């Protein structure tokens, strides 16, 4: 059984294609299950992820693919999140709309700082040693 539970689409800014594109490829490659799991939007942080305004269309696009291709492949609704305690209530609400959540570790804070750093943009020795 071939499965993939970690996929992204154009909304994150570092992948291409829409949900249906990924579903078609998965079917052609013989996958039985596919999780659509783009980077979750979060309040006040927009780097490498969809915008909050895109979330509704993202979920709708997955639901449409589930209806259209459900007889060929099992499609799951998911998001990849960065965890920060102050976003817990937001994530609790998101979980109600999803089949699962992936924890990604692409963003972090340095103790004593309020700023969120992206792991993709680490360029100072003190960040690496933190």
Across the structure, where does each feature detected by a protein language model lie?
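Histidine-centered catalytic micro-motifs
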Residues: 2-13, 36-41
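Conserved, mostly hydrophobic/aromatic
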Residues: 6, 26, 101
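Acidic-and-aromatic substrate-binding clefts and catalytic sites of carbohydrate-active enzymes
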Residues: 11-17, 82-87
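Glycine-rich, proline-tolerant flexible connector loops at the mouths of alpha/beta enzymes
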Residues: 38-50
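Extended substrate/RNA-proximal surfaces in nucleic-acid metabolism proteins
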Residues: 48, 53-130
């Amino acid at each position: 059984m071939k499965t993939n539970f970690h996929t992204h689409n154009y909304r994150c800014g570092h992948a291409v294609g829409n949900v249906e594109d990924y579903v078609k490829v998965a079917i052609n490659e013989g996958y039985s299950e596919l999780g659509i799991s783009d980077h979750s939007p979060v309040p006040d942080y927009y780097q490498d992820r969809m915008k909050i305004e895109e979330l509704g269309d993202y979920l709708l696009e997955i639901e449409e693919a589930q209806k259209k291709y459900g007889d060929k492949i099992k499609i799951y609704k998911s998001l990849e999140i960065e965890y920060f305690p102050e976003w817990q209530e937001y994530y609790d609400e998101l979980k109600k709309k999803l089949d699962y959540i992936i924890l990604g570790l692409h963003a972090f804070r340095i103790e004593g700082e309020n700023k969120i750093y992206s792991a993709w943009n680490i360029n100072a020795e003190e960040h690496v040693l933190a």
